[in-house]
A protein has these predicted regions:
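Post-HEXXH active-site segment of zinc metalloproteases
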Residues: 318-340
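Active-site recognition of the HExxH zinc-binding catalytic motif
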Residues: 303-319, 347
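Contiguous, non-catalytic segments that form substrate-binding/exosite surfaces or channel walls
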Residues: 131-290
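An active-site-proximal "capping" alpha-helix that borders the catalytic cofactor pocket
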Residues: 335-351
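Short, surface-exposed patches at the edges or C-terminal ends of soluble domains, predominantly
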Residues: 1-73
Length: 514
């Protein structure tokens, strides 16, 4: 190395080697990234690079050294503090929370005696938009229309609100640049959160580093917008981690153009719940898995790449139904299998990514596995909990294959069996979908039920478990759906224990951010 080398030296030869104390692993800044150089002959030897897992280890070392600092380049905490201490933001928050109890489930305000007060609070929201607008110059058209929609709501006598025009102009997908903030004002419900279409105010930060933009060229998903919370009203002080246009109150369905995923909330609650499960179950973890639990920024990176691949998978493969299931009423295990299919496909894709040297591939596998096993089944109530059922299916399959053991109140994995077992489950779900193309809807529901019950026992009082000849197959499909119990597939004894001991911890993740 040159005497004035300004990079980092990670490994050197020993003092007695020839040459002594020579650098064999170094890294330095290169434009916006890092360049890593390894003297591989001194680490493995040219004749042994293909032995054992040496080539994989070499790629892992390169990936690890190229990371540099794992901290984000920007201070989100400061950005949040500036917004949340702003008088305009505080005034808007107050106005929103004062409006909340006046609104009906559909967003309207029926009691005319409250209209005067409501108009005052909506005007406060409009004032706040005008004061904050200079901070969002890229949203000038949207914010102008949002004010018009709010004024139209007042003029309508607070009928069901209609934000169609402003929603058409709210396009975060057109500005997917790292650390770009967006202000959103809509009457909306929040998925897995507030079921009512209350007026909400939200400020988001786009999480779009260069490496993710490059990955999106391979995994094209133009509607995908990973975001972080900067500020939000209480409609998001819950478990909701998504921001979708279909949640907004509009007079007609708007074309699907974007979908926001709060990667900071996803990562933070994952880390908290899995760490709790690790302690409770005396779970020994590989170093990489522990690293994921210990590092919020790494977890966010992991979740955005998982989400990018998962989201696009909904429209790929053998699809015996509308993959997004919009306004379809089906037994809830159909939704469970669809979400699970996309996660399993993502899990498999990490094997391709890993072969290409992607540093996040192994972390995505741990994230999918642990989120599915530990958080999903005990989050939310037991009323048609389709995400929870997906986790129950994964547990049952891994347990059946001997890749997972729960003995002496301790959970262990046979890691050498895990990947093959998950891929096998993915193949089984794919086969179910492939064969479903030749079935009627009801026949596919029945085949899917039989697949699930092969792993997760149904409720003893299940109507469906009595046999297909007991189903009212001659009537409307809704009659068969109505026979599905709210908790058709109850938690097993493992999850009953996990829920009893970790339930409070899961509840404590309500409203969590990074």
């Amino acid at each position: 190395l040159e005497a004035d080398f300004a990079g980092e030296v990670f490994l050197r030869t020993s003092e007695t080697a020839l040459p002594p104390s020579a650098a064999v692993a170094v890294a330095t800044r290169a434009a916006e990234g890092r360049a890593v150089v390894l003297a591989d002959s001194d680490i493995f030897g040219d004749d042994s690079i293909s032995d054992l897992d040496n080539s994989k280890l070499l790629l892992n070392i390169l990936g690890f050294l190229s990371l540099g600092s794992k901290e984000p380049s920007r201070d989100i905490a400061t950005v949040r503090a500036v917004l949340t201490q702003s008088p305009a933001w505080l005034s808007m928050q107050t106005a929103i929370e004062e409006l909340r109890p006046l609104q009906s489930k559909d967003g309207s305000i029926e009691d005319q005696s409250n209209h005067g007060e409501a108009a005052m609070w909506v005007e406060k929201v409009i004032e706040g938009i005008n004061e904050l607008a200079p901070k969002f110059p890229h949203q000038v058209d949207y914010l102008s229309q949002a004010i018009k929609d709010l004024q139209s709501w007042i003029n309508s006598g607070f009928a069901i609100p209609d934000f169609y025009e402003s929603l058409e102009l709210f396009r975060p997908d057109r500005n997917r640049n790292n650390d770009v903030q967006h202000l959103a004002v809509f009457s909306m419900y929040t998925q897995n959160g507030n079921p009512n279409r209350n007026l909400e105010v939200l400020v988001t930060n786009t999480f779009w580093p260069d490496w993710l933009a490059q990955k999106e060229q391979k995994y094209s998903n133009p509607a995908f917008v990973p975001i972080e919370f900067i500020g939000f009203t209480s409609g998001y002080d819950n478990n909701s981690a998504v921001f979708f246009p279909e949640t907004v109150a509009v007079r007609e369905v708007s074309t699907y153009k974007w979908g926001g995923i709060f990667c900071d909330r996803e990562a933070a609650r994952f880390r908290k719940v899995v760490a709790g499960a690790q302690e409770l179950l005396y779970l020994p973890l590989p170093y990489d898995a522990q690293e994921l639990l210990d590092d919020q920024f790494l977890a966010q990176e992991t979740f955005v790449l998982w989400d990018l691949i998962h989201d696009r998978t909904h429209s790929r493969g053998d699809l015996p139904f509308d993959p997004f299931m919009i306004k379809q009423r089906m037994p809830y295990w159909m939704y469970a299998l669809e979400e699970l299919r996309c996660d399993l496909a993502t899990f498999r894709e990490t094997l391709v990514l890993e072969a290409e040297g992607d540093r996040l591939a192994k972390y995505i596998r741990y994230a999918i596995l642990f989120d599915r096993l530990f958080r999903f089944p005990i989050t939310g109530n037991r009323v048609r909990n389709y995400d929870g059922l997906g986790g129950q299916i994964v547990f049952a399959h891994l347990h059946k294959k001997g890749a997972l053991h729960w003995r002496d109140n301790r959970l262990t994995f046979e890691w050498e069996k895990v990947i093959d077992s998950v891929v096998e489950l993915s193949n089984q779900v794919d086969a179910l979908y492939h064969e479903g193309i030749n079935r009627s809807r009801l026949a596919q529901w029945i085949a899917s039920y039989e697949f699930v019950t092969g792993l997760v026992p149904p409720h003893p009082a299940s109507n469906w478990a009595k046999g297909t000849d007991q189903l009212p197959s001659a009537g409307a499909l809704k009659d068969v759906v109505n026979l599905v119990l709210d908790d058709e597939f109850p938690l097993n004894v493992f999850y009953e224990t996990l829920n009893r001991k970790l339930g409070d911890l899961v509840l404590a993740t309500k409203g969590i951010t990074a």
